[in-house]
């Protein structure tokens, strides 16, 4: 049995599903006569709504739950850097992805079972303060399973209001 990461598994699945959908578009008209089926998620939502009525998640609520209660610690200011730690002890290093985008840091992890199904997930997202250099984000995984994220602060500079004048001849 070969060891695959969640990224490899997702890449294989997305390739197979996209290639199968493109091949189905070229299939004969007999296959187009099959009745349309609801995607599995829509069926699940429909069954949920039947039992509990209409329920929507407020936009302020997170989509994922931390791996452990209190999984994300407080953000600390350490000199010229910010630092926070998250508990990802249930995941292998290759299961963890840290991304910086649009002034946010996001930590995601996904553990797969041997059959390729998702066993456990983790997601934590936080907004970077305005004085952080987003290209300076680093992470380190400790032996106890905590992932430490650090980001350097921009040096404090006085904001100087620039005054200028532009003249255009018409």
From Swiss-Prot:
It comes from the Eukaryota. Residues 62-170 form the sHSP domain. Keywords: Chaperone, Cytoplasm, Nucleus, Stress response. One of its GO terms (cellular component) is actin cytoskeleton. Residues 1-71 are annotated as: Required for localization to SC35 splicing speckles. Pfam families: HSP20. It is found in: Cytoplasm; Nucleus; Nucleus, Cajal body. One of its GO terms (biological process) is response to unfolded protein. GO terms for molecular function: filamin binding. Belongs to the small heat shock protein (HSP20) family. Interacts with C-terminal domain of actin-binding protein 280. This is Heat shock protein beta-7. The lineage of its organism: Eukaryota, Metazoa, Chordata, Craniata, Vertebrata.
């Amino acid at each position: 049995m070969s060891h695959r990461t969640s990224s490899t598994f997702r890449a294989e699945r997305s390739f197979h599903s996209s290639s199968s959908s493109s091949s189905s578009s070229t299939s004969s008209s007999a296959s187009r006569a099959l009745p349309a089926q609801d995607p599995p998620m829509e069926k699940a939502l429909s069954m949920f709504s039947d039992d509990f009525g209409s329920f929507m998640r407020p936009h302020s609520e997170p989509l994922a739950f931390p791996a452990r209660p209190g999984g994300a610690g407080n953000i600390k200011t350490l000199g010229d850097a910010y630092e926070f730690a998250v508990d990802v002890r249930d995941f292998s290093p290759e299961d963890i992805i840290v991304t910086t985008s649009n002034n946010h840091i996001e930590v995601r992890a996904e553990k797969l079972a041997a059959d390729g199904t998702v066993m456990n997930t983790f997601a934590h997202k936080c907004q970077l303060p305005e004085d952080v250099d987003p290209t300076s984000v680093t992470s380190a995984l400790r032996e106890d399973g905590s992932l430490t994220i650090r980001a350097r602060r921009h040096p404090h500079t006085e904001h100087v209001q620039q005054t200028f004048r532009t003249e255009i001849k018409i």
